[in-house]
A protein has these predicted regions:
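Charged catalytic cores and adjacent phosphate/nucleic-acid-binding surfaces used
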Residues: 1-117, 123-143, 148-179, 190-346
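Short loop/edge segments at beta-strand edges and connector loops
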Residues: 182-184
Length: 346
């Protein structure tokens, strides 16, 4: 069987080594894949069993003898609503079912928010970022370079903010009906303040508020900073709420439910940072955000134009948590997003 798999794959297995005893494919860069060879008649059942977490199978009360020929019929026989494959994780999906049609898909994304340019630590100019956003079918772009406190990232002093505003105004005339929004990723300071004066913050179309400094803190300190930033009337989106970097850095401890409650109370959107090392907010809290009516923004935090494509990871992570199109900020079309921002300004 393994010889047949290897022969049919051909060059596609370049760099992979087959471990026949364990059934794993091991890549020279360290990736591991498990290959399960099954009879054609068992394929759908095995796909269901392998594609769901052990916890989901346990909560469903499922065993192989319960298989009814399809996943749809199997759920029906168990007397529960159908659960889409992306949500079979054993985390509230049986008690909080979501219709597949309402789940966010990548094709639902209309705009790309939270992006950096050569004004701070990005690799592409504002114009290059805009043109690529247009190329991949977006209706609008949010430029959110680093703010003045972020000296390590060439954060923007007020003079450079105003310079960028002028460039965006010119590009918006040239690229209409596509629109670039004037934003900033404003650092949340140690006391929870944002790092510009109110008269400057008020000139941005949108503000992503994020913590980048003094990450080694207690939950009480982290919550004080986050809640104060959420309550700031100029905050549009709370950026990467825990500051985690997967496989590299634990996030600072927070009470996710209190953060989401505060976002709901203050009309602040919650970022699902789509960078594969962040995926922050964690998908396990997305359903609570849906329950509380909080808008979630799937943001790439792009530092180059191709970083936009990280939104694919964000969409998949959001689906696991039941992220619905109707509560995804950047699934709004341009007119709807403009109205959303205008309402926030009142």
């Amino acid at each position: 069987e393994w010889e047949e798999v290897s022969a049919s794959a051909g060059d596609d297995l370049s760099g992979w080594t087959v471990d026949k005893e364990s059934g794993f494919l091991r890549h020279e860069q360290g990736f591991v894949l498990e290959i399960e060879v099954v009879m054609h008649s068992d394929f759908d059942r095995m796909l269901f069993e392998k594609g769901a977490s052990d916890r989901h199978i346990e909560l469903l009360g499922y065993s192989s003898s319960d298989w009814k020929g399809s996943d749809l019929d199997t759920y029906a026989a168990k007397g529960v609503n159908f659960v889409v494959p992306s949500r079979r994780e054993g985390h509230r999906e049986l008690e909080r079912p979501v219709e597949e049609a309402s789940l966010l898909k990548y094709s639902d994304i209309k705009g790309v928010l939270h992006n950096h340019t050569t004004y701070s630590d990005g690799l592409n100019s504002v114009e290059e970022m805009a043109l690529y956003a247009m190329e991949i079918g977006m209706e609008y772009l949010g430029i959110c370079d680093h703010s003045k406190t972020a000296g390590y990232a060439r954060g923007l002093q007020v003079e450079r903010v105003l310079q960028q505003f002028e460039e965006i105004d010119t590009l918006n005339q040239q690229l209409w009906p596509f629109k670039i929004f004037k934003g900033i990723e404003s650092d949340i300071l140690g006391n929870g303040d944002l790092d510009y004066e109110p008269e400057i913050l008020g000139r941005f179309d949108m503000v992503v508020a994020s913590i980048h400094s003094n990450l080694n803190m207690t939950q009480d300190k982290a919550m004080d900073r986050l809640l104060r930033a959420i309550e700031n009337p100029y905050t549009t989106i709370l950026g990467h709420p825990t500051g985690r970097l997967l496989l590299m850095r634990e996030g600072y401890p927070i009470d996710h439910h209190k953060v989401i409650d505060a976002c709901a109370a203050n009309g602040v959107a919650l970022e699902l940072n789509a960078h594969p090392y962040r995926l922050d907010i964690d998908w396990r809290y997305v359903d609570y955000a849906m329950e509380k009516g909080v808008m979630v923004s799937v943001n790439p935090d792009a530092h180059e134009k191709r970083g936009y494509l990280d939104m694919h990871f964000g969409v998949l992570s959001g689906q696991k948590g039941g992220l619905q199109t109707s509560q995804t900020l950047n699934a709004l079309n341009l007119v709807e997003f403009e109205a959303y921002l205008a309402k926030r300004k009142k």
